[in-house]
A protein has these predicted regions:
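N-terminal secretory signal peptides that target proteins for export/translocation
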Residues: 1-16
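Bacterial N-terminal signal peptides
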Residues: 19-35
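Signal peptide processing junction and immediate N-terminal pro/mature segment
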Residues: 32-46
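C-terminal PAP-associated
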Residues: 42-451
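Short amphipathic alpha-helical "recognition" segments used for binding
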Residues: 6, 21, 111-114
């Protein structure tokens, strides 16, 4: 398996130069603020060979009916006690080595009064009751995901989605996610499979809705796909260009778990946590050819990099996931800049990291007639100390108490049972500098009840 190297500084593109400060808060979240600065020096690794890009085309394409015309989901025979678990597990599992380094940015004081203004509007969105009403069961985890455009709010959860206007009026839905791909050439996309993501592309005035496929988990002869729908206009209730991109690498059918999406100037970027049928594990990084997709070109291309998680020199650098940058605001990233992708590493986890850090990767892609692409580790930024692996028992995830809640089945998902930052990685270009903001769950003090 090919491995990584740092991209040389004489490449004909501009780097995003980043200085990071990590703000860890008492609610078990860490806000990571990154501003432009001269680059930190990457720690040396044993590998200097480049990761190999794999280019391919969409395996299927068509245009959907108008979303507003899709029928609402039909209610099936309900079982109030049934809870569908969507938690495919694979790959290594980060284990805590105890509360060692602590929270180096723990805040001991809080403002005397709230400093955030009251919301302008509050309305009910989707819930697990919508799953119950459509499928006859509830789903865990719900994986809520939403995006705001100029005139709409689109929300997706496992396994339904809906469109609202800015006043909170329901315009379409709730609809089961698979209905968006009804009669598509890849039948697996028509199943409501889970892990949906919705993005609004403010540069193109388009909506992106997605999900993965899961039928290959029960049939090792079947591959997996990222199912991606791009609205044909700025109206999220209209028609969509539908695409399917296969995730197979080196003949291995990789399941693209935990997909996270980002928007850039000429690419849509996906990062996934991938595992194969036996011990195969790694992080998938994809770029999709944006200009062809928004114009409904069936020959839209993709490129994939696979970072091998079974390589002990690479595992500390990627842990359980990377996040692609996703811009906020109207100012585009600078022309020909690499796309920043961020991961975290924790020296108190069991993946071999020797210090706490943010790992900054650069993804570069040119969609020429013969495309070129590269992915490499730009730098590692040391952070204040943190522990990201909670001592969660008896479950692996749902163990964070809530005020007034005594039923342990209603405790919160800690979101840090693995070593990874959490969606999104918000990018903003302020013209004079650029910034990136994301989150990392941490154990603020020993024990879950104090996190």
């Amino acid at each position: 398996m090919k491995t990584l190297r740092r991209i040389s500084r004489n490449r004909a593109f501009t780097y995003v130069r980043i200085l990071a400060a990590v703000l860890l808060v008492l609610t078990a979240a860490a806000l990571v603020f990154l501003a432009v600065s001269p680059p930190a020096v990457a720690q040396p690794t044993a590998h200097r060979q480049p990761l190999t890009p794999k280019f391919s085309k969409a395996v299927a394409f068509d245009v959907s009916p108008a979303l507003r015309s899709l029928p609402l989901g039909k209610k099936h025979v309900a079982d109030p006690s049934k809870l569908l678990e969507i938690r495919p597990e694979g790959g290594p599992r980060a284990r805590s080595r105890g509360y060692k380094s602590g929270d180096g940015a723990l805040q001991l004081l809080k403002p005397a009064a709230p400093t955030i203004p009251a919301p302008l509007l509050t309305f009910e969105g989707l819930s697990n009751e919508d799953n119950f009403n459509i499928f006859g069961f509830r789903v865990n985890p719900p994986d809520p995901n939403g995006e705001v455009g100029p005139n709409h709010f689109v929300e997706m959860i496992n396994l339904v989605f809906a469109v609202y206007d800015k006043a909170g009026n329901l315009l379409a839905g709730p609809i089961d996610t698979g209905s968006l791909w009804t009669d598509f050439a890849i039948p697996d996309c028509t199943d409501p499979s889970g892990d949906p993501v919705v993005l609004y592309d403010q540069f193109m005035d388009r909506w992106l809705l997605s999900q993965f496929t899961t039928s290959g988990l029960n049939d090792p002869t079947k591959p997996f796909w990222n199912c991606v729908a791009i609205s044909t206009s700025g109206d999220p209730t209209g028609t969509y260009y539908r695409y399917a991109f296969e995730t197979t690498s080196d003949g291995i059918f990789y399941f693209p778990d935990y997909p996270k999406y980002g928007n850039w100037t000429d690419s849509y970027v996906i990062t996934t946590r991938e595992f194969g049928p036996t011990i195969e594990y790694g992080i998938g990084v994809y770029a999709l050819e944006k200009n062809k997709m928004v114009n409904g070109d069936p020959n839209a291309r993709s490129v994939k990099f696979f970072i091998d998680g079974n390589d002990p020199d690479l595992l500390p650098l990627v842990g359980d996931g990377l996040l692609p940058a996703d811009p906020d605001g109207k100012q585009k990233p600078k022309t020909d800049t690499a796309i920043p992708i961020i991961g975290t590493q924790d020296d108190d986890a069991s993946y071999g990291a020797t210090f706490d850090a943010l790992n900054i990767w650069d993804l570069f892609i040119k969609w020429r007639s013969t495309p070129i692409a590269s992915l490499g580790l730009n730098t590692q930024l040391h952070t204040a100390s943190f522990d990201s692996i909670f001592p969660c028992t008896p479950t692996s995830r749902d163990c964070l108490p809530q005020p007034g809640i005594v039923n342990t089945a209603q405790y919160l998902d800690i979101l840090s049972y693995r070593q990874r930052p959490t969606f999104r990685l918000a990018y903003r270009n302020f013209k004079s500098y650029e910034s990136l903001v994301t989150n990392q769950s941490v154990e603020a003090t020993p024990g879950v009840t104090h996190s």
